[in-house]
From Swiss-Prot:
GO term, biological process aspect, one: DNA damage response
UniProt cross-references to CDD domains, sorted A to Z: CESA_like
GO molecular function: glycosyltransferase activity; ligase activity
Protein family according to the UniProt entry: Belongs to the glycosyltransferase 2 family.
Keywords: Glycosyltransferase, Ligase, Transferase
EC number: 2.4.-.-
Gene3D superfamilies assigned: Spore Coat Polysaccharide Biosynthesis Protein SpsA, Chain A
Entries under Pfam families matching the protein: Glycos_transf_2
UniProt keyword Glycosyltransferase present: yes
Protein name, entry field: Uncharacterized glycosyltransferase YaiP
Top-level EC class: transferase
Length: 398
């Protein structure tokens, strides 16, 4: 039943997306300041900053060295020598990501600021920023883009996640905007804000998911949040199961803590259609999986449990989604890997059971994780518009 509901939702979202293709990006160049926090980002920082500085939509790029202990400061100095006044290098004692972003905001002079991460590839020769800026010009106070996956140099786990990540984010956040009035989150990897709005509310380090906390704060105060599905960026993913576990634990526990902090939102339109469905899907999924697995184990044994994890219609659906992702990333290996995306479903369910529900009542979060960075980013001169690998390229070069 849930698979058919998902198929109907997907068709509806596709039709809605096709209806928006006539919208044009803003052509107002040089009117956005980019702010990038950096803590021990030496391996990937230079290429990320170079791509941002080559983007004609940005007036200046502000990078805040948040007390790094590697060569981040030296990399920033080299970028400064190359780009001069268009690059603003700021160094401070470690305060956390929220504090670094707010310090960078002190140097912003444009009416709009774009926030991203040091490991994220932002295409310099596409109109993604233009589509976000167009939403601002239509009255939005903050706009979220789509964080996809950087596959160059990535291992097996990022490829598995990339099989469904982009289409699922587009579908979920579009549906949240239509029904709940705003997307669930403006990702820290791709968000644009009116500068005066961000200065008024700002980021807080009271949670480890400052982007989610800020999004919900803006919604609670009546600000207009929008989604720009044609602005796509490419952050690095975790290559090891341990780092992936820690990152998902931070996200899910942070989600639970934000529900605790924003109780007044829970039964609003946004809460009912954008916040609660994420949790209800988990609770429903856990119940269905446990019931199905138990029945299969009793009737057919362990192999029945394995077959229940990969029902034929579900495999077909995720392979279709994987085929789109494979075309988009120019990596056809994503099609056969698509059924393995169930690993991330089970990962999320397990973390919710172990940590998420407890965090809602205690408000306690783990320390912020720091995934291992790798230097294989796409450079501005790359022929393709997004990071890609071929089917014969090694999954990991890191």
């Amino acid at each position: 039943m849930k698979t058919w509901i998902f198929i109907c939702m997907s068709i509806a979202m596709l039709l809605w997306f096709l209806s928006t293709l006539r919208r044009k990006p803003s052509q107002k160049k040089g009117c956005i300041d980019a702010i990038i926090p950096a803590y021990n980002e030496g391996p990937c920082l230079a290429q990320s900053l170079d791509n941002l500085l080559r983007n004609p939509y940005f007036c200046r790029v502000i990078c805040v060295n948040d007390g790094s202990t590697d060569n981040t400061e030296a990399v920033m100095a080299e970028v400064k020598r190359k780009w001069g006044d268009r690059f603003v290098a700021v160094t401070q004692k470690n305060t956390g990501k929220g504090g670094a972003l707010m310090n960078g905001l002190n140097y912003a002079t444009c009416d709009q600021v774009f926030l991203s991460d040091a490991d994220t590839y932002v295409p310099p020769d596409q109109d993604g920023m233009g589509y976000m800026l167009a939403e601002i010009e239509r009255g939005a106070d903050a706009v979220g883009g789509i964080p996809s996956t950087a596959l160059k140099g990535a291992g097996l786990l990022p490829h598995i996640r990339a099989t469904v990540k982009l289409p699922m984010i587009v579908m979920k956040r579009t549906l949240q905007q239509l029904l709940g009035g705003a997307p669930f989150i403006i990702s820290g990897a791709c968000g644009m804000f009116r500068t005066d709005v961000l200065r008024k509310f700002g980021f807080s380090d009271r949670t480890k998911v400052e982007d989610l906390d800020l999004t919900w704060t803006l919604v609670a105060n009546g600000y207009r949040i929008r989604q720009a599905n044609r602005c796509i960026v490419y952050p690095q993913e975790c290559n090891s199961p341990r780092e992936e576990w820690r990152r998902w634990r931070r996200w899910i526990v942070g989600y639970a803590v934000c529900m605790r902090l924003h109780k007044r939102l829970l039964f609003s339109r946004f809460g009912i259609f954008s916040i609660f469905p994420m949790l209800l899907v988990v609770l429903y999924g856990v119940g269905i999986y446990l019931t199905t697995w138990f029945n299969e184990f009793i009737t057919t044994g362990p192999h029945g449990v394995v077959l229940a994890m990969f029902p034929l219609i579900w495999v077909g659906v995720v392979c279709v989604i994987g085929a789109f992702s494979a075309w988009f990333h120019r990596c056809w290996l994503l099609v056969p890997l698509a059924p393995l995306s169930v690993v991330y479903v089970l990962l999320a369910y397990a973390i919710w059971i172990i940590y998420g529900l407890i965090a809602f009542f205690t408000g306690r979060e783990p320390q912020r994780d720091k995934p291992t960075r790798y230097s294989a980013l796409v450079e501005a001169s790359t022929a393709y518009s997004q990071p890609s690998v071929t089917g014969t390229e090694k999954l990991s070069e890191a």
